[in-house]
């Protein structure tokens, strides 16, 4: 009852709302005293207006003019207030419920840099980005995708810096999605990516707010999805997949060294087993005599050819890696380490594989973990098996043919219109300062020019530090 003659209905779903807001800002305001003296009308619509403007102490209140949005508003965690005799209502924001706090990201860890990571709450995530980019030009475009789940999706970009055509293309692709459910950002990624049948990612993901902020400041667009800590970044080039946010927090020479190390490790993880197969099977003359004799002695008594040996070891390691990921955390690392040691040693002693092959597979596995992006590391895992088959059939000529085909494929990839090998194909000298090599911050005057044609300048020139003249 509200007053003496009016019946109110306060509707919400327990578990989706903030109970403190319900109790103190809604229920207490409506039931703490008799409002008959303050109501000068008996019209239900006017009473709702009085309740909205005078009695509710909540920051976000809106009118419910028809019943269609009622269910969706309640399911989002809002509270709906209805009064007997009126077809209108009031929607009071009371979104709450249990959620995980801001913690250090489980992936893409850094030694130096912010330790905060995204959560499963999209509003918490957008707030984390706004805390880093305090600009009114940081725009957020909201969408609801999924006929059943009605998942909140937020597209974030800097107006005036991001390419308007790319922003509109992303929004158009999001609007074309017609499916029952969106439970994670991976759904969105597969629906909007340029090319489906490629092992290389054309959209990257991260759970680091600083990585999203840095990408937005370069003119890229971020896509956040409610219910997951992983946000998407587009457009990207392949070289961005080898860069870590920590590269920008330490000296440029160390960052450059680490970038080159990651690229070399990617090539090693992709090609090392196939090179071993090709050389040991077809091109033994390329090895020094001492090394060749050592490898031949190790392979004496091995019943399998090198390609079968390598495939068996690689598949075994993939099984161990997957088991380590799926097992409880306390047991996963132990299974991976102990399983690899025990199986490797037992296989060598049983004469099933050579010691050299165990070393090759182990070093390949270690190199695959160097890449900061899980997506590009997974690409190397898939391509590794293809190159091993080429090496077993055609030797080094097969590996070179595979590399040429891969290069042609990379040259044809696009990420929302951006060539995947930018700034090398097409070659843009001005953008070389933050690709393989990272120059000092005072030298990075412009943003990537192919993305930012209208506002490419990042900072003023001539900021190189110099020692002061103490005699003046």
How would you label these PLM feature ranges?
Residues 275-278, 288-472:
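Generic detector of multi-pass transmembrane helix bundles and their immediately adjacent loops
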């Amino acid at each position: 009852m509200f007053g003496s003659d009016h019946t109110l209905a306060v509707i919400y779903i327990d578990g989706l709302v903030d109970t403190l807001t319900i109790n103190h800002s809604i229920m207490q305001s409506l039931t703490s005293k008799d409002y008959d003296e303050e109501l000068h009308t008996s019209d239900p619509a006017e009473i709702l207006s009085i309740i909205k403007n005078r009695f509710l102490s909540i920051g976000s209140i809106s009118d419910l003019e028809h019943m269609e949005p009622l269910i969706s508003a309640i399911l989002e965690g809002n509270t709906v207030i209805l009064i007997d005799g009126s077809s209108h209502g009031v929607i009071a924001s009371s979104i709450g419920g249990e959620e995980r706090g801001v913690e250090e990201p489980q992936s893409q860890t850094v030694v130096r840099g912010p330790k905060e990571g995204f959560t499963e709450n999209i509003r918490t995530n957008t707030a984390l980005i706004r805390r880093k980019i305090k600009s009114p030009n940081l725009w957020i475009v909201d969408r609801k995708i999924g006929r059943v789940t009605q998942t909140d999706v937020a597209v974030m970009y800097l107006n005036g810096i991001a390419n308007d055509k790319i922003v509109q293309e992303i929004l158009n692709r999001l609007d074309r999605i017609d499916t029952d459910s969106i439970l994670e950002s991976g759904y969105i990624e597969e629906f909007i990516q340029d090319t489906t049948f490629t092992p290389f990612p054309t959209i990257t993901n991260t759970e680091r707010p600083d990585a999203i902020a840095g990408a937005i400041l370069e003119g890229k667009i971020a896509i956040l999805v409610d219910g997951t800590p992983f946000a998407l970044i587009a457009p990207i080039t392949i070289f961005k997949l080898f860069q870590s946010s920590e590269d920008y927090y330490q000296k440029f020479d160390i960052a450059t060294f680490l970038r080159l190390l990651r690229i070399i490790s990617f090539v090693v993880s992709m090609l090392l087993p196939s090179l071993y197969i090709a050389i040991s099977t077809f091109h033994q003359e390329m090895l020094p005599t001492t090394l060749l004799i050592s490898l031949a002695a190790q392979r004496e008594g091995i019943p399998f050819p090198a390609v079968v040996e390598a495939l068996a070891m690689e598949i075994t390691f993939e099984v161990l890696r997957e088991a380590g990921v799926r097992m409880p955390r306390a047991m996963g690392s132990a299974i991976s380490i102990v399983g690899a040691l025990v199986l490797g040693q037992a296989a060598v002693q049983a004469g099933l594989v050579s010691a050299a092959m165990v070393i090759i597979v182990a070093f390949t596995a270690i190199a695959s973990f160097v890449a900061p992006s899980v997506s590009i590391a997974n690409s190397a895992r898939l391509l590794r098996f293809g190159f091993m088959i080429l090496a077993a059939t055609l030797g080094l000529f097969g590996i070179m043919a595979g590399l040429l085909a891969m290069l042609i494929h990379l040259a044809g990839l696009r990420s929302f219109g951006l060539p995947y090998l930018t700034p090398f194909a097409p070659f843009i000298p001005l953008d070389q300062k933050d690709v393989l090599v990272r120059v000092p911050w005072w030298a990075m005057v412009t943003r990537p020019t192919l993305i930012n044609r209208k506002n490419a300048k990042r900072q003023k020139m001539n900021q190189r530090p110099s020692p002061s003249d103490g005699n003046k």
